[in-house]
């Protein structure tokens, strides 16, 4: 669920209405949400605060935002940050941004079939490539790949109740 303004803002009003309805449903049913947010940080956050953050929980899928945006998301407390192959890209500053957050707030994602990590960039993404994202986080945090994998798996299990 979420808001995507990458191509245009023609249906922003409708996107916000539907997004807020879906947020309400997630609260009513105590279900986590995976928030898709593309060129719509302010709009997504406005909707979240409009609905209320109390029992809302989830993941900000495919996060590529700024340090300031990350800080705002972390204030929500019940949300994880979804990290995929973008963190491995040569020109991405996502690694620097993520240094401001604990591994215990991260979730590994593939976004398959898109956003393959280096060295598979430009190819169809596959779940097996997630290891490259874990390796990059291992480098960034100075932790073992096993620790990154175990911590992010535990985060996912806790969020989704599995």
What is each model feature region?
Residues 92:
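Conserved catalytic/ligand-binding micro-motifs in nucleotide and anionic cofactor chemistry
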Residues 64, 85-89, 112-114:
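Short, acidic/turn-prone active-site loops that include or flank metal/cofactor-
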Residues 34-35, 59-60, 82-84, 107-110:
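Active-site neighborhood of phospho(di)ester-bond hydrolases with catalytic His/Asp-centered motifs
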Residues 1-76, 88, 96-97, 101, ...:
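Divalent metal-binding pocket/active-site signature
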Residues 104-126:
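Short acidic/histidine-rich active-site segments
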Residues 3, 114, 158:
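Active-site micro-motifs of SAM-dependent methyltransferase domains
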Residues 128-162:
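Mid-to-C-terminal alpha-helical segments outside catalytic/metal-binding sites
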Residues 78-80:
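Conserved acetyl-CoA-binding loop of GNAT-fold acetyltransferases
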């Amino acid at each position: 669920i979420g808001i995507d303004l990458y191509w245009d803002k023609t249906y922003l009003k409708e996107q916000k209405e539907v997004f807020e309805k879906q947020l309400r449903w997630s609260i009513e049913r105590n279900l986590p949400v995976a928030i898709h947010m593309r060129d719509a940080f302010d709009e997504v956050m406005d909707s979240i605060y409009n609905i209320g953050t109390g029992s809302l929980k989830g993941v900000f899928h495919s996060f590529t935002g700024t340090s300031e945006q990350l800080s705002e998301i972390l204030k929500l407390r019940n949300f994880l940050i979804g990290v995929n192959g973008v963190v491995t890209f040569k020109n991405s500053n996502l690694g620097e941004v993520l240094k401001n957050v604990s591994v215990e707030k991260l979730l590994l994602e593939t976004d398959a079939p898109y956003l393959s990590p280096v060295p598979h960039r430009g190819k169809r993404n596959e779940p097996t490539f997630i290891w490259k994202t874990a390796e990059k986080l291992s480098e960034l945090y100075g932790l073992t790949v096993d620790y990154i994998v175990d911590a992010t798996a535990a985060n996912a299990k806790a969020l989704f109740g599995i």
